[in-house]
């Protein structure tokens, strides 16, 4: 983990209220594991807490990385107003990402994402492709209007799409998409999305030997000191055992934490 003033190279609104930001700096050299996140200081004196945003793509050759975020409040609204040439105070990479150590060439791997949980799965899919694995994507969005990076994912492997309103792909949610299209027994399952989607994936694959889920949580420090992002551990009858999403996660094995 390091801290750096990174330079903004580009900013693009890829869907309504959803932005892709390209950053450049030496900090990119520390970014190796898909699924980790950056803790970014909002460039406003009245907003003290950093915002955790997952890493979407990494390019070591150009020392650049990309993040994708949705405007949810004052902090992300401030990010959306930044322009190329400006700088951001970035801390990272943080958290435990997806573990690819057991993946072999020709392994079929399921990547399951929903909405704003999709971004970290792009770098994951790209690294799986480099290993020689076969990524298969299952993605859900509210509608076609808020979809993004469709062509980029399709260049990496087979993609199955669902939208709540049926405007693109199957009409329904990701769980319904899995019921219809997830016909193989994959070597691994990786997922990132909201709690409802993760609960569906967890129930379906909790007995799989290599199923990993990236959890979302509100964070303050981002380094495990404040205990503001804890999740309870599955099977703990006392209700006292917990794990920190920012430090021990955000990626946990399926079945480990209560969703």
Which role does the model predict for each range below?
Residues 74-218:
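FNR/FR-type flavoprotein reductase catalytic core
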């Amino acid at each position: 983990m390091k801290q750096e003033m990174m330079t903004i190279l580009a900013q693009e609104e890829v869907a309504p209220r959803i932005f892709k930001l390209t950053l450049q700096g030496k900090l990119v050299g520390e970014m190796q594991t898909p699924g980790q996140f950056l803790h970014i200081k909002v460039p406003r004196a009245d907003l003290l807490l950093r915002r955790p945003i997952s890493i979407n793509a990494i390019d070591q050759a150009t020392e650049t990385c990309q993040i994708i975020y949705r405007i949810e409040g004052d902090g992300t609204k401030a990010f959306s107003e930044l322009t190329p040439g400006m700088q951001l105070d970035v801390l990272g990479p943080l958290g435990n990402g997806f573990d690819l150590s057991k993946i072999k060439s020709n392994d079929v791997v399921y990547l399951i994402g929903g909405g704003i949980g999709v971004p970290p799965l792009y770098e994951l899919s790209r690294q799986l492709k480099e290993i020689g694995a076969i990524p298969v994507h299952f993605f859900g969005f509210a509608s076609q209007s808020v979809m993004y990076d469709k062509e980029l994912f399709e260049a990496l492997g087979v993609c199955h799409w669902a939208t709540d309103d049926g405007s693109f792909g199957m009409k329904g949610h990701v769980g319904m998409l899995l019921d219809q299209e997830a016909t193989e027994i994959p070597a691994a399952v990786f997922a990132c999305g909201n709690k409802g989607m993760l609960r569906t994936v967890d129930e379906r694959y909790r007995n799989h030997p290599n199923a990993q889920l990236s959890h979302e949580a509100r964070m303050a420090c981002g380094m495990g000191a404040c205990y503001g992002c804890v999740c309870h551990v599955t099977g703990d009858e006392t209700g006292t055992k917990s794990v920190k999403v920012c430090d021990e996660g955000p990626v946990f094995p399926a079945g480990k934490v209560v969703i």
